[in-house]
Amino acid sequence: MQILHTMLRVGDLDRSIKFYQDVLGMRLLRTSENPEYKYTLAFLGYEDGESAAEIELTYNWGVDKYEHGTAYGHIAIGVDDIYATCEAVRASGGNVTREAGPVKGGSTVIAFVEDPDGYKIEFIENKSTKSGLGN
């Protein structure tokens, strides 16, 4: 078994694609439209291939906002320079909700941001991912 993708419903597909490409450095891998059921899918990721996990952005035509509820937590992305990545989010008008720094009680460097639709994304500095969270 493997993780194939995580689906996020978005209110403005172009804005979301731009964020995931320009700010997070992902590539647009493919898109698919379904006129009968009125939705468009965009798949983004860092690698293309059967073993690579992807983000699926789903735009339901005419729906511009969703309630997230309390069940969704976040996705996590390893980054080489967490401070520069947070600055790129800020420069794009994004929201940094937890500044980069060590996790409480440990040395793993993390930050939290929100994408244009308010989904939470955790950044973990790559040199920290080897030791695991909380170390």
Swiss-Prot record:
Ni(2+) binds at residues 5, 56, 74, 122. The active site is at 122 (proton donor/acceptor). Its cofactor is Ni(2+). GO terms for molecular function: lactoylglutathione lyase activity; metal ion binding. Pathway: Secondary metabolite metabolism; methylglyoxal degradation; (R)-lactate from methylglyoxal: step 1/2. SUPFAM superfamilies: Glyoxalase/Bleomycin resistance protein/Dihydroxybiphenyl dioxygenase (SSF54593). Binds 1 nickel ion per subunit. In the homodimer, two nickel ions are bound between subunits. CDD domains: GlxI_Ni. Substrate binds at residues 9, 60, 74. One of its GO terms (cellular component) is cytoplasm. InterPro entries: Glyas_Bleomycin-R_OHBP_Dase, Glyas_Fos-R_dOase_dom, Glyoxalase_1, Glyoxalase_1_CS, VOC. It comes from the Bacteria. One of its GO terms (biological process) is methylglyoxal catabolic process to D-lactate via S-lactoyl-glutathione. Its EC number is 4.4.1.5. Belongs to the glyoxalase I family. Homodimer. NCBIfam families: glyox_I. PANTHER family: LACTOYLGLUTATHIONE LYASE. This is Lactoylglutathione lyase. The lineage of its organism: Bacteria, Pseudomonadati, Pseudomonadota, Gammaproteobacteria, Pasteurellales. The gene is gloA.
